[in-house]
Amino acid sequence: MTDKGKNDLTSKAKDKARGNPEKPPYWFEIIVSDPQKRTGDPGSSSGYVSYQISTKTNNTSFYDNRGDPESIIVVHRRYSDLLLLHDILLNRFPTCIIPPLPDKKVFQYIAGDRFSQRFTQKRCHSLQNFLRRVSLHPDLSQSKVFKTFLVSKDWESHRKVLQDSLQPNKDEVTDAFMNAFKTVHKQNEEFTEIREKSDKLDRTVTKIDKLFHKVVKKNDSMSEDYTKLGSNLQELQELVTGENEELAAKLKIFNEGVTQLSYGLQDLTKYLDYEYIVDLKDLEHYIDSMRQLIKLKDQKQIDYEELSDYLTRSIKEKNNLISGYGGSNFFANKLEELAGINQEASRREKINKLEGKITSLTGELENAKKVADGFEQECLKEIDHFESVKTAEIKKSLGSLADHHIEFYERILEAWEKVDDSL
């Protein structure tokens, strides 16, 4: 192997190491926009919202027979399509943190508010967050179903095939139910620290979320007050026009400043409501997705620990039989004796059965150990990727929050400097 080949392998190994998550081989730019109300199936009174998904990538396979690889791929999908994509990824990549989708928002469906601009625009942003997170994952972004979702013009036929292939994993559901009230006896300290940090982050994000909901509500109230003030100033201007033109001109200039303040506050509030708070809520859900993977890891660990306990009990029972103590209680032995059962033959038969069970359990325990250790390593790798994405998202979100506030204050300062100069 050449030095270059060795260096490539070494570099790839380092990318997969802890603390240095592997990056996807291609970049994606995905925008979800233009929500449109569509009619449902013939004979159905219900409708749905269709979203335009625009994709640009340097992965040339996405442009097969589609012309210029610099062009933008545009498809239209509905929420249920993205839900199917999410479920397929969850089913096919059990060791990955699958980015969450926004909630179904049952209240809006009941209230008939799911076609409002506020609801659909906020959902657009959240769906875009979901697809962007998938595109940043080195495995999910290279999946065939993700490519089909983003490029296929015949999605309906693919959708039916995908729905048929989506079978619930009954074993995992059963394991999750059986282990719901069990805990890992020997938890990795690293996972204990991860849990503590994620819980703290979740509490902090939840507090910020609640705080900015109050900010939005207060800003809406202030904007409404400024609008009313502007209307009153307009009426006052009309009253003095013709009698005191100088005062009317100054009222007009002052009203323009108030109007700019009202519009600026509305724009800032819209950003907070439609994007920043949505990002906070999506981050809360993303943290929960990470927790779900850790729970699944714990189930594998619990399976191993229970097998280990079962094997230990079987070995102990066999040793007791060999030493003459017996594996049954006194009354059971007496009943066997009265029934004419040969105690020594019965003891040897039990020992033979236990030896077979111990051999079988030893093999199962080794496999369970491999599964648990392998899942733990994959889980740690996924958490590294989660941390990388989460850090970048928070940094970008805070930067955007600062930029919008700076833009707001610069806009207001410019408007009121003009007012001050004119007055």
Curated annotation (Swiss-Prot):
Organism annotation: Saccharomyces cerevisiae (strain ATCC 204508 / S288c) (Baker's yeast)
Disulfide bonds: none
Coiled coil: 217-252, 346-381
Membrane topology classification: Peripheral membrane protein
Domain PX residues, every copy: 29-157
Protein name: Sorting nexin-4
Gene Ontology molecular function terms on file: phosphatidylinositol-3-phosphate binding
Cellular localisation: Cytoplasm, Cytosol; Preautophagosomal structure membrane; Endosome membrane
Further comment found in the protein's record: Present with 358 molecules/cell in log phase SD medium.
Presence of the UniProt keyword Membrane in the record: yes
Region ranges (Disordered): 1-25
Function summary: Sorting nexin, involved in the separation or division of vacuoles throughout the entire life cycle of the cells. Involved in retrieval of late-Golgi SNAREs from post-Golgi endosomes to the trans-Golgi network, for cytoplasm to vacuole transport (Cvt), and autophagy of large cargos including mitophagy, pexophagy and glycophagy. Involved in proper sorting of the v-SNARE protein SNC1.
Presence of the UniProt keyword Cell division in the record: no
Binding site for a 1,2-diacyl-sn-glycero-3-phospho-(1D-myo-inositol-3-phosphate): R78, S80, K104, R123
UniProt record, GO biological process: autophagy of mitochondrion; cytoplasm to vacuole targeting by the Cvt pathway; early endosome to Golgi transport; endocytic recycling; glycophagy; intracellular protein transport; macroautophagy; mitophagy
Gene Ontology CC: cytoplasmic side of endosome membrane; cytosol; early endosome; perinuclear region of cytoplasm; phagophore assembly site; phagophore assembly site membrane
Pfam family, one: PX
SMART domains, per the entry: PX (SM00312)
Domain comment quoted from the record: The PX domain binds phosphatidylinositol 3-phosphate which is necessary for peripheral membrane localization to the perivacuolar punctate structures.
Biased composition (Basic and acidic residues): 1-21
Family: Belongs to the sorting nexin family.
Subunit and interaction comment: Forms a complex with ATG20 and ATG17. Binds also to SNC1 and SNX41.
Effect ascribed to mutating Y79A: Abolishes the intracellular punctate localization and decreases the cytoplasm to vacuole transport
The entry's keywords: Coiled coil, Cytoplasm, Endosome, Lipid-binding, Membrane, Protein transport, Transport
Family matches, as InterPro entries: AH/BAR_dom_sf, PX_dom, PX_dom_sf
